[in-house]
Amino acid sequence: LIEKYWGEFEIKDQPTFEVRKESPITEVVETEVWGPEAERLYMGFRFNGANTEDSRILTMTDMVLSNSSAGLIDLNLNQSQELIGGGCFPMIMKDYSLHGFYGSPKPGQTLEEVKDLLLSQIEEVKKGNFPDWLVGAIISDLKLSQIKKMESNSGRANEFVDAFILDIPWNEHQNEMAELEKITKQDIIDFANENYSDNNYVIVYKRTGEDTSIPKVEKPIITPVSVNREDQSDFLVSLSEEKVKDIEPVFLNF
């Protein structure tokens, strides 16, 4: 089918993808968003893109911080109820990667306090204050997730999609887990100390209140439209006068 419908298409030169060089983040970039919903914050650090050492160690660092059960944020902040629903996630893209953090305040708590709590857990990683067994457990959990993913057609298809859109050679994509297994606790500690500081992130505060920056547009005068509900076209009249035979069932003869 591919040859039949697309076989005559000529192969053209593929455009070369070039990463747009972004300036380093040297001071905190803060943004505020206002609305009636509950307050929360999102914070992000920028890293190198897919198929780099950054992206692999970022995956491990993220799991040390938050893995839904035994991460530092899970234990020290969520289970101890220091805040509401804190966590983090990696977003691996072709040009750059993002390590995002989020959290909501308890009653009487400020978003700035939530930010400080999340940053404090990064400091714990820098100091190596997480158990030695956690790195091996993370690898086991990632392997289990990979096995479950490969049990479905959609999961296997997504593996091809990820490798394609991130421009990772298939053999290297399949070897990703082996590369993750080489990462040690010290690698994670060094990575955290080199890449996370108190001034190289972007943060968005979602605050409760009225957004006064919303532009107002004057309502235009709308010209009434006559819908002519009673009028019928000649075509409608002729169509309505046509006689249609009743549908009779046709039974299969076995």
Regions found by a protein language model. Name each.
Residues 2-8, 21-25, 47-48, 60-65, ...:
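A broad, low-specificity signal for short, low-complexity segments enriched in glycine/proline
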Residues 43, 53-65, 73:
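Active/ligand-binding-proximal structured segments within catalytic/core domains
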Residues 1, 38-49, 74-182, 202-207, ...:
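M16 family metallopeptidases and their MPP-like homologs
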Residues 1-34, 39-40, 75, 171-254:
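Proteolytic maturation boundary segments
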Residues 6, 65-69, 119-126:
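Short amphipathic alpha-helical signal-transduction/dimerization elements
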